[in-house]
Structure formats: structure tokens, C-alpha cells
Amino acid sequence: MGTVRPPRPSLLLVSTRESCLFLLFCLHLGAACPQPCRCPDHAGAVAVFCSLRGLQEVPEDIPANTVLLKLDANKISHLPDGAFQHLHRLRELDLSHNAIEAIGSATFAGLAGGLRLLDLSYNRIQRIPKDALGKLSAKIRLSHNPLHCECALQEALWELKLDPDSVDEIACHTSVQEEFVGKPLVQALDAGASLCSVPHRTTDVAMLVTMFGWFAMVIAYVVYYVRHNQEDARRHLEYLKSLPSAPASKDPIGPGP
């Protein structure tokens, strides 16, 4: 009667190891895409669609091989520094229709080379630091933001490659020059207007107040000096009048023969 041999330990070990590796691979695939998003993969290039997901912040687990990232129509209000720095293959980033209030100098660090389109339209951005977007070679959409038009914004815009299809929709919500409010900013700048030639009103007011104060002090000193001299002259004249008059001297020499 033949004996039944148990399975070889080596084969069992290999089978268990392969099962674990397969399980880990499946778990990795499941975690490669942010939970509320869709991440179709085409020939190793991932497109991440997170539109209309109610997101309040940028997901942290975006695949590194993402080429298209749609984060539009969410509730994102803050972009942390370096939020996209691991996405070296990213070509298009859509952040439109959010509640973004500000962008920092390091917000888009790591995207300088490959990014082709950055959509920041329909947000709440008021100011743009000069070094926040200047290193990007992408076309940038900034329309429908409550921009405060000042010299710093003008200098920042000159460094950007603005999307020509939406450039005329970039308007001033507030401005250091009231005539710019509500008007297409780039058109005004192209026509020769400048936001950098506006005098600082606060400085001017302080200077005028200082000058007026010095002028008032000079006038007061002159008035005091004149009145003081007039008073001295009056007292001196009264003193002279109070002196007794000397009698007329008689000629000691008599009349000639």
C-alpha cells in the first residue's frame, strides 16, 4: 500500500508568497487613485477626474504618473506649498470654480517644465505674487477672480503666458486707480496704462501734513519776531519822548561892533 506524501514545503511557500504579492498588488492598485475620483489609465498615463466631488483640499494620494488632473468645481480654498511637486508628468491642471483665495511662491513648485495648462479661473484670488507663477511655461487662465489691481499684479502678469481665449476676461475688482475697476486689465496695459506710476496717497498726505506744519511754524516765528520788534521799538520811542528836552544854548559871544 502506497503512502500519501504531503505537499512539499517549498511549493507551499512559493504559492503563499505569490498569493501575498498578488494581494499587495491589488491593494496598491486600489490605493493608486483618490477615493472620490476616477483614474483611467491609458498606456501608463493616468488621468485623474475629481470634478464635483465636494473636496475641500487637494488629495494627497494622486498617482505620480498623472498627466491630467481635474479638481474643478469643488470647495478647495487653500493650496499648500508643494502640493503637486511629485507630479512631474502633469500636463494639465484644472482648479477652476473653487474657493481658492491665495497662491504662494511654492504652491506649484516642481511643475515648471512639463505643465501646459493651468486653470485658476472662477476663484477668489485677489493678489498674485510675482514669483508664484513666473517660472511656469504653461498657459494660465485667471479670469473671473476678484483681483486687486496694483503694481505688483502688473509686474506678475508681464511674466505670465496668459491663455489668449480668456485674457480679456481678466478684470479689476478693486484697484489703486479707480478708472481700472470693472475693465479688462490686459487691454488697458497694452494701451499704455500703468499701475506702477500711481503715487502713494498715504505718503503724500503725510508729506503735506509735515510741510504744512513747518510752514505754520515759520509763519508763527515771523509774526512773533515782527510783533516783538514792534513792541521794542514802541517802548524805545516812548522812552525817548519821556526824556526832558534840553534848553536852547545862548551864544556867549556878543554882537560885533
UniProtKB/Swiss-Prot annotation:
Pfam families: LRR_1, LRR_8, LRRNT. SUPFAM superfamilies: L domain-like. InterPro entries: Leu-rich_rpt, Leu-rich_rpt_typical-subtyp, LRR_dom_sf, LRR_TM_domain-containing, LRRNT. Residues 33-64 form the LRRNT domain. GO terms for cellular component: plasma membrane. Keywords: Leucine-rich repeat, Membrane, Repeat, Signal, Transmembrane, Transmembrane helix. LRR repeats lie at residues 65-86, 89-110, 114-135, 136-157. This is Leucine-rich repeat-containing protein 3. It comes from Homo sapiens.
